[in-house]
Amino acid sequence: MRLENKDIRLASAVLEVELHQTSALSVPTCPDPGRLLTVKPATSNYKLGQADPCIPYAGEAAGKSVCVPEHTEFGSFLVKGSSSLKDLSFKEDTPLLWNSSQKKRSQLMPVHHPEFIATEGSWENGLTAWEQKCMLGKEVADLSALASSEKRDLAGSVHLRAQVSKLGCCVRWIKITGLFVFVVLCSILFSLYPDQGKFWQLLAVSPLENYSVNLSGHADSMILQLDLAGALMAGGPSGSGKEEHVVVVVTQTDAAGNRRRRPQQLTYNWTVLLNPRSEHVVVSRTFEIVSREAVSISIQASLQQTRLVPLLLAHQFLGASVEAQVASAVAILAGVYTLIIFEIVHRTLAAMLGALAALAALAVVGDRPSLTHVVEWIDFETLALLFGMMILVAVFSETGFFDYCAVKAYQLSRGRVWAMIFMLCLMAAILSAFLDNVTTMLLFTPVTIRLCEVLNLDPRQVLIAEVIFTNIGGAATAIGDPPNVIIVSNQELRKMGLDFAGFTAHMFLGICLVLLVSFPLLRLLYWNKKLYNKEPSEIVELKHEIHVWRLTAQRISPASREETAVRGLLLEKVLALEHLLAQRLHTFHRQISQEDKNWETNIQELQRKHRISDRSLLVKCLTVLGFVISMFFLNSFVPGIHLDLGWIAILGAIWLLILADIHDFEIILHRVEWATLLFFAALFVLMEALTHLHLVEYVGEQTALLIKMVPEDQRFAAAIVLIVWVSALASSLIDNIPFTATMIPVLLNLSQDPEISLPALPLMYALALGACLGGNGTLIGASTNVVCAGIAEKHGYGFSFMEFFRLGFPVMLMSCTIGMCYLLIAHIVVGWN
């Protein structure tokens, strides 16, 4: 701000007051700040930068006393390096119209002093100047008040941030304390109850000779669990009763009570089919204990020929009812989902906590498993498949093939983003119909991430879309998804005429209809979502680079001086990149349209930047990967290949490691998603423990009861609707593999019940459709979802439970609705049974 005297005679004295952002420098005023006069006589000998003395005078023209500062006290405050500037001690909260008399006693001089006498015209000009100065003083005062208000707001904001930080620390402390207490409590409960173990007893039964035993010592028990092992089949007998089977009769005497004068004898019959292939199968059944009387068990075989049938029998008394065990299982499952949904802990740790809680619950009810038994619950075939394919993909990424595929996909889409997403989703759905879903996403995820980085897209949204269509496509064939494999492999269903071709024919048509509806629905769900990043690609890549550098620094454990030095260098690199990012954010601003108009020019630039880096390694990788995929496909048709998917993936990884001649093996191991593998191991233990707590069995039995309650003329349609939706909702919450394995015998018993007489195959199609499509409901509903999320997180693009849920759950609802309508038309209207 510049204050000048308009009088020509006083033009020689110019006083400049610069208002800076950090300090406010103002001229001193009289006790009456209503009028301000800053003048300097031309005849004065004052140096430039000094002010006149000021003496009080009752100005007649002005009506009030006006003053100017005396130079001896105010000093040369504009001279650079002057000590007067230090004496003034201006601060950020110093008012612009600062009274110098508050700091020092200033002498005042009347304005009617001879040296200040001027002509009438100049005096009028002075009055005008005074009015302007008064207006200026008021504005400056307003600015000072505004600055003070902003500082108060800033202080309030700082105080609010401090309160939020303190609250965050309290919440974090409560979380850690609560989880630690929970873990300690579960550990104590698990350690208090010993491992009872199962004592198997060998016995032989025949049509002419049965086996009987009396059990006692169950004073505090509520449930009797019987385990039968041998050449058995998990399923009830058909209505004809011609199959060979074993009948287990459990009898107990209920003592006389208040309502009964005589004791009552309770009898339970359990029929188990014999397997002609003599496979070793373990089946279990629970029976309620109604009294403290001894329990009698009798086993007899019903055979077409007289022969002995060897069996193994084990029994165990449990201290909690089935309802109590189911309630505890539901509470544990709800707790695990709460930890994952709200991201209280990492999903791997959440699965481990859930597994520990389930094991503690089993220990309390008297069914604590041994460590060997718990390890047997882990599906090592799935883990071997994941590990082998991760090794293959890690070596494959060294060739630059993923970058090349990304550029080709961009070229085929001609710069249209949604055309490219449509092609990626369609390719993923088709490939997953003939390969395992996990294998499909292990191959597609790196390509998609690199493609999105090239096009400045958000990879999270595209990856979620691919996962959804991978799960949909996997339901089309008998080998696309594990539930389908379990259903087709069942021997009882094979006897009913279920084969690969028939199953695929039924499922393929329904999945095609689901795909046709799911694509428009996905586009509708993405309608208001910005697929492009809001910032330029340079900024996005720089942020991602900072994130990767920081993760790398955090993963280095400072065990030695050299590692500490390397970690320090990485952190310095992070600081340098953050400084560069701040400069880029200040410089670059651009808007990106939803369709790239200059795609042809971009293609040429991308082709120059992203090429195949190692052609010889690419040939080796393609050869091994082609062999592995071929073996995956032939494994389901050629009986001479005695290798499962896990062995094929492991052998392929070993082959490629030999051909690639990689000396630094730790680099490849660093690219393996160990957190994902550990999550699956914990999830397998959790789901198997929940199965032992009778959760899955309870859901199946309640579904069967609901179907029996429906009138007979509507029972078939109601069964299809119930099975589809129960399977879909259950598979979105728990693993669909144990659920499918448990529901198959339940549905077989339901179809073979003479009172219901429902066809079994349509029920199996409904089970397969619901179990496969239900995996899109939540992030942990299918193995494919977890694998994709783990790889994306490894690349710095992880997505949360809710991000997947907002897109996956609506697609799951719509796809299950379309699939249900297809099954109703095919089996109710058309009668394709």
From Swiss-Prot:
It is found in: Melanosome membrane. One of its GO terms (molecular function) is chloride channel activity. Most abundant in melanocytes. Also present in neonatal and adult eye tissue presumably as a result of expression in the retinal pigmented epithelium and choroid body, known sites of melanogenesis in the eye. Small but detectable amounts also observed in fetal, neonatal and adult brain. Moderate amounts detected in adult testis and ovary. Not detected in heart, kidney, spleen, liver or thymus. Its main location: membrane. Residues 194-325, 370-381, 439-501, 639, 697-718, 781-810 are extracellular. InterPro entries: Cit_transptr-like_dom (IPR004680), Diverse_Ion_Transporter (IPR051475). The chain crosses the membrane at residues 173-193, 326-346, 349-369, 382-402, 418-438, 502-522, 618-638, 640-660, 676-696, 719-739, 760-780, 811-831. Coiled coil: none annotated. It catalyses: chloride(in) = chloride(out). Glycans are attached at N210, N214, N269. PANTHER family: P PROTEIN. Contributes to a melanosome-specific anion (chloride) current that modulates melanosomal pH for optimal tyrosinase activity required for melanogenesis and the melanosome maturation. One of the components of the mammalian pigmentary system. May serve as a key control point at which color variation is determined. Major determinant of eye color. Seems to regulate the post-translational processing of tyrosinase, which catalyzes the limiting reaction in melanin synthesis. This is P protein. The gene is Oca2.
